[in-house]
Amino acid sequence: MIEIDGDNLTLEDVYSVSVLHEPVELSTKARNKVAEIHRKFLDLISSGQTIYGVNTGFGGLLNIKISREEEIELQRNLIRSHSAGVGKYLPTDVVRSIMVIRANTLAKGYSAVSTELIDALLAMINKDVVPAVPEFGSVGASGDLAPLAHIGLAMMGEGQAFLNGELMRSDIALSKVGLKPYEFKEKEGVALINGTSMMAGIMALVTSRAYRTIENAVRSSLLSFEALRGTSKAFSDWIVSARPHLGQIAIAEKMRKYLAGSKNVEKSDKEKVQDAYTLRCIPQVYGAVLDTLEYVSSVLVTEINSATDNPLFNGKEVVSGGNFHGEPIALAADFLSIALTDMGNMIERRIARLVDTNLSGLPPFLVKNSGLNSGYMIPQYTAAALCNRNKVLSYPSSADSIPTSANQEDHVSMGSTSTLKLLEIEENLEYIVAIEFLLGAQALEFSQDPISPVTKAIYTKIREYVKPLDKDRPSYLDIEKIREIMNKNELINAA
């Protein structure tokens, strides 16, 4: 059971709830705090004080006063009117990630919602009633309004939701698992939707996957490195320590460890002076990507344990601020997009080197009787196409603000676009790595000298699923199979 309290949610917790379906609950301490602040907030409302989003309109309508009798209707209308997203629905694990992060931000208490709202969110997560959330509609300030509104709409029983993978009316989905539609109270509509939880939810899953992909990419590079007879001298501890970036040192250490015992490498260390950059500079490039991921993760951990609503209430005063602005997430997502894209660039160049007989000394396109057989010519095209796609996607969305809400919201982060692009970039990178595994294993079919025990274990694991290429056959299923075992950690755990 994962317990949320508004302060201590980890990326591992988010992954456990969203992907592994670990149940989640509100801590007793947070429950008491939320209930106390909510009670004080209701007293403040009763005093007649003007509070944005409680007894006023929203955005460009902030100067319109709302009567006491209309305050609850205002919240429900907000959910309905802001449910304006378009496009395909976000994956259900992403939506679950969004929901648990939103529940955690509300658990801080500053949003002044009732415990019932948080419980309703968590009940849907635990019963696996997942709102259908279109991917497009957020500009990343004020938060992720449209996507989060679709979650609220499903909570009200007026939207759509997935139950056991089946799309249906949300009221039916709720009824099937014994839940009732939620009735939003004062401020609860704006508290739910005015925040960065879509951006953060996507980022939480992407970062988890990116750590795994980097580990896989290190291993796929071993196959290419051995097949191309690289020299490990450039990975020497004293070389990388002379420029002591933490990621560079960590990757070089892995390369030394994993290549230990390779007769291929021992021979190259004696005969070669230096390699091409895509072999020699793996620690420098992968290390920089790892350092970027570490930075992004630190930003994200802060974000998922922050109050991103507006206005906020500390038990004494209500203040309109800007914690909903997604700039921290937007910049981090754009940064990671660039890093992962460039990692793919390096891998694709090694793939190209493997199939080029003039550079590799291996049979053209890694197949016997080439000419009659085209071998692995086209997987390199696929890798190039994916790299091109990632290069286009890596343009920073955060550099392109477009004012909204009659210029009341005159600078926005576009962080949702940044994270949606990042989600695709990371998936494309997984395929590029899978292609290197496929071609690297095939290249080792022509190796004469013994490879390292780690490289051998990875090669052997691949061969459990994909046989060597003796003559032309479709390769798309092999690429998909390798990506599948990558994401099950089978190649990481092979040695």
Swiss-Prot record:
What is a single molecular function from GO for this protein? histidine ammonia-lyase activity
Q: Where is this cross-link: 5-imidazolinone (Ala-Gly)?
A: 141-143
Quick one: a GO biological-process term for this protein? L-histidine catabolic process to glutamate and formamide
- Maturation and modification: Contains an active site 4-methylidene-imidazol-5-one (MIO), which is formed autocatalytically by cyclization and dehydration of residues Ala-Ser-Gly.
Top enzyme category: lyase
**UniProt entry keywords in alphabetical sequence:** Cytoplasm, Histidine metabolism, Lyase
InterPro entries to which the protein is assigned, alphabetical = Aromatic_Lyase, Fumarase/histidase_N, HutH, L-Aspartase-like, Phe/His_NH3-lyase_AS
UniProt catalytic activity: L-histidine = trans-urocanate + NH4(+)
Cellular component annotations (GO), alphabetically ordered: cytoplasm
In the Enzyme Commission scheme, what number(s) does this protein have? 4.3.1.3
Q: Does the keyword Lyase apply?
A: yes
**UniProt-annotated location(s):** Cytoplasm
User: Please, which domain of life does this record's source organism belong to?
Assistant: Archaea
The PTM 2,3-didehydroalanine (Ser) maps to: 142
User: Which pathway does the record list?
Assistant: Amino-acid degradation; L-histidine degradation into L-glutamate; N-formimidoyl-L-glutamate from L-histidine: step 1/3
Please tell me where this protein is predominantly located.
Answer: cytoplasm
What HAMAP family does the entry give? His_ammonia_lyase (MF_00229)
Q: Which family does it belong to?
A: Belongs to the PAL/histidase family.
| Protein's UniProt name | Probable histidine ammonia-lyase
